[in-house]
UniProtKB/Swiss-Prot annotation:
Source organism of this protein record: Clostridium botulinum (strain 657 / Type Ba4)
Gene Ontology CC terms, in alphabetical order: cytosol
Pathway: Purine metabolism; GMP biosynthesis; GMP from XMP (L-Gln route): step 1/1
One Pfam assignment: GMP_synt_C
Name of this chain's protein: GMP synthase [glutamine-hydrolyzing]
InterPro entries: Class_I_gatase-like, GATASE, GMP_synth_C, GMP_synth_GATase, GMP_synthase, GMPS_ATP_PPase_dom, NAD/GMP_synthase, Rossmann-like_a/b/a_fold
Location of the Glutamine amidotransferase type-1 domain: 5-195
Residues involved in ATP binding: 223-229
CDD domains for this protein: GATase1_GMP_Synthase, GMP_synthase_C
PROSITE patterns: GATASE_TYPE_1, GMPS_ATP_PPASE
The enzyme's E.C. designation: 6.3.5.2
Bilayer-crossing regions: none
Assembly mode: Homodimer.
GO molecular function: ATP binding; GMP synthase activity
Length: 510
């Protein structure tokens, strides 16, 4: 696709995805690549700008990440952040020092607003620092353009070569001028147009899919979630009835979800849809299994088996559509980030699979997927449907999965979702659900002692699922949810609310 590109070079920093999000907020496409990416690969990608992320290392560390010095002579603007700033100075023969005192948290910074980087900004503002080492001598051709009381070089520039470095983190909210500074880098330094929109993305994807597929047949694994739904519609717009969607109902869906999926895609979108009722098969495979990773793998493998069986019945199929999105790729592990969970879309595909993959959304964060869905005319309610994991309720029922536990979780979850909708909070909360933590506790109902299940409610705010905070749901809403669940769902006598952010917790419990 012909689009302007910024590369975010990953040095292992905790804010890498946030940097990418900040760039994309300016309608500029960017990709995160490992620091080991070769000069040849960078030249081939032809980025209009490069951003070095922060990272946990010191430039003097034995195994500290490095880049080839030639990168700074490519004529491509570079912005180094924190470790990226220090690495730029070190690579170009400046000096980096380790002081006795580190600088961490909100800090007042003095800015030279004659620099393009700080154009139209105040001379003094607030930034967020998180570093031990700092630049004590800038490289030849550079000048200092920002200072703090503790850091003699809070930012530097070589305006002629368009090389910039900042010791602080412009991507976080605590740097009050950070978004404006990144905008200056993108538009005043890199001279980008900012013309990457979701409508142009959809048009380009539809055109590319048409060219790739030709007159061949395509199948799509449809779950009814936002990602697979948008992926299916974008491919259907490209090739129409050449696409057949297979909906594997594994019996691990939310209340009435299977029927809703069938109705929307068969009736409303007029797609070729095959629904496979495989509940007994999946529950049989999960019998006696309580380890969450084993559950994920079993469901992923069985899903593929069922899917392949159905695909064979269709005859000559060349392509498989998947709703993989960018966080799936990032969280499933790169050179600089550990695997957090086995993602249902990324892991578990058999090596001998005969289909070629079509992943139209693999470049997008979740909020961008929703925007594409709106552009494609998908109903608002479906586009804003709750994120739902591939393994379904199997990872919201902690421990062994049984029909009884699924029924309890399904009913409690339906009540929670219903009350959130009644309170008008559906689109204010990123994700909300009930789970069964495999805990029983003593209670009293009427005059009798009970020993029943506990339901945990989880609700988070986020924009892309990379980080999240627990949602501050009004007490009166939580009270109503709690009273309804203990009165309407058998075998439940206690409700708890999860008040943990991500990190340290993940959004799902398993």
């Amino acid at each position: 696709m012909n689009k302007e590109l910024v590369l975010v070079v990953d040095f292992g920093g905790q804010y890498n995805q946030l940097i990418a999000r900040r760039v994309r907020e300016n309608r500029v496409y960017c990709e995160i690549v490992p620091y080991t990416t070769s000069i040849e690969d960078i030249k081939e990608k032809a980025p209009k700008g490069i951003i070095f992320t922060g990272g946990p290392n010191s430039v003097y560390g034995e195994n500290a990440p490095r880049v080839q010095k030639e990168l700074f002579d490519l004529g491509i603007p570079v912005l180094g952040i924190c470790y990226g700033d220090q690495l730029m100075a070190h690579s170009l023969e400046g000096e980096v020092t380790s002081p006795e005192k580190r600088e961490y948290g909100k800090t007042d910074v003095n800015l030279d607003n004659s620099s393009l980087l700080f154009k139209d900004m105040k001379e003094k503002d607030q930034c967020w620092m998180s570093h031990t080492d700092y630049i004590s001598k800038v490289p030849k051709g550079f000048k200092i353009i920002a200072t703090t009381d503790e850091c003699p070089c809070a930012a530097m520039e070589n305006a002629e070569k368009k090389l910039y470095g900042v010791q602080f983190h412009p991507e976080v909210e605590h740097t009050l001028f950070g978004k404006k500074m990144l905008k200056n880098f993108l538009f005043n330094v890199c001279n980008l147009k900012g013309d990457w929109t979701m409508s142009s993305f959809a048009e380009q994807q539809i055109k590319a899919i048409k060219e790739k597929v030709g007159n061949k047949k395509v199948i799509c694994a449809l779950s009814g979630g936002v990602d697979s739904s948008v992926a299916a519609v974008i491919v259907h717009k490209a090739i129409g009835k050449q696409l057949t969607c297979i909906f594997v109902d594994h019996g691990l869906l939310r209340k009435d979800e299977g029927d809703q999926v069938e109705k929307i895609f068969k009736d409303q979108f007029d797609m070729n849809l095959i629904r496979v009722n495989a509940q007994d098969r999946f529950l049989g495979k999960l019998k006696g299994v309580s380890d969450p990773e084993r559950k994920r793998k079993i469901i992923g493998e069985e899903f593929i088996r069922v899917f392949e069986e159905e695909a064979k019945k269709l005859g000559d199929i060349s392509f498989l559509v998947q709703g993989t999105i960018y966080p799936d790729i990032v969280e499933s592990g790169t050179n600089t980030s550990a695997t957090i969970k086995s993602h249902h879309n990324v892991g578990g595909l058999p090596e001998d699979m005969e289909f070629k993959l079509i992943e139209p959304l693999r470049e997008l964060f979740k909020d961008e997927v929703r925007a594409v869905g709106e552009e494609l005319g998908i109903p608002h309610k479906l586009v804003w449907r709750q994120p739902f994991p591939g393994p379904g309720l199997a990872i919201r029922v902690l421990g062994e999965v049984t029909e009884e536990k699924l029924a309890i979780t399904r009913e409690a979850d339906a009540i929670f979702r219903e009350e959130i909708a009644k309170a008008g909070l559906e689109e204010k909360i990123w994700q909300y659900f009930a789970c069964l933590p495999n805990i029983q506790s003593v209670g009293v109902m009427g005059d009798e002692r009970t020993y029943c299940h506990t339901i945990a409610l989880r609700a988070v705010t986020s924009s892309d699922a990379m980080t999240s905070d627990w949602a501050r749901i009004p007490y009166e809403v939580l009270d109503k949810v709690s009273r309804r669940i203990v009165n309407e769902v058998k075998e439940v006598n206690r409700i708890v609310y999860d008040v943990t952010s991500k990190p340290p917790a993940t959004i799902e419990w398993e």
